[in-house]
Amino acid sequence: MLWYHLHIFGNNILFSGLYENQEDRQTIRVIEKNGIRFSLLAYTFGVNETTNYKSIQKQLKTYPYILGQLNKEQIKEDVNNAKAQSDVVIVAVHWGKEGHSELSDLQQEYAHYFADLGVDVVIGNHPHLIQPIEKINHTLVIYSLGNFLSTMKDVYNQLEGMVCFDFVKKEDEISIENIQYVPLVNHYNDNVVTIYSLKEYTSTLASQHSILKDQADIIKEFKNYVKQMISNDDIDIEMWGLYEEKNKSININNLYGWWYCFFLS
């Protein structure tokens, strides 16, 4: 199954975190856009205990290179290699506790470790809920964006986020500017899934949602939850669709961000 996923996309998608051999494991994924070189790294705390859990664990013992795991020594080597080849280092990380909006000790430990190594952006997932955003030194840490396409059953599994920001290069310095957070709703009925921005989501749509249909004030609750979870006095984050006086025109199809997918435009 692991080998199948390595080849299913061919050369059409650059991805990181799953590797075919040791040489592939040591190859940093680099992409250049608008004169800026980006390195993409990916790690996980482990694998879920699914029906083929024992088989995967056996593969990992036999072929430890196939999966990017949270190992500080390996991470340090990867980040140093990435920094030598690129201007920006982005890390996707599978961490935290499922169903918990609070940060785990492991998340906080590794967030600070990535920051100490000089990683530019950390984008996390696994909790299936949105979690805070913060800056540690110069590292932007997005702890969890929640789900994207999902038929999970809890109310707050339907609330998710996308993050948009600019990398600005001035001489030899690169900064992260214009951070925008776009709350999304995972809408489904009869297992047909559609993604809406929270700004566009209506009470009529909510009444047709398989999970949200009995939640009378869910749109208001979602907005309050996003404000509570994402607002950060230390970072200028525009909360798209939550504060009308700050709204700007955003093409939602061109936004950057979601879990392990990076769109550079």
Predicted features and spans:
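Acidic, metal/ion-coordinating pockets
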Residues: M1-N247
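Intrinsically disordered, low-complexity segments enriched in serine/threonine/proline/glycine
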Residues: K246, F262-L264
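Tryptophan (W) side chains
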Residues: W3, W258-W259
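Targeting/processing segments of secretory and organellar proteins
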Residues: K248-N253, W259
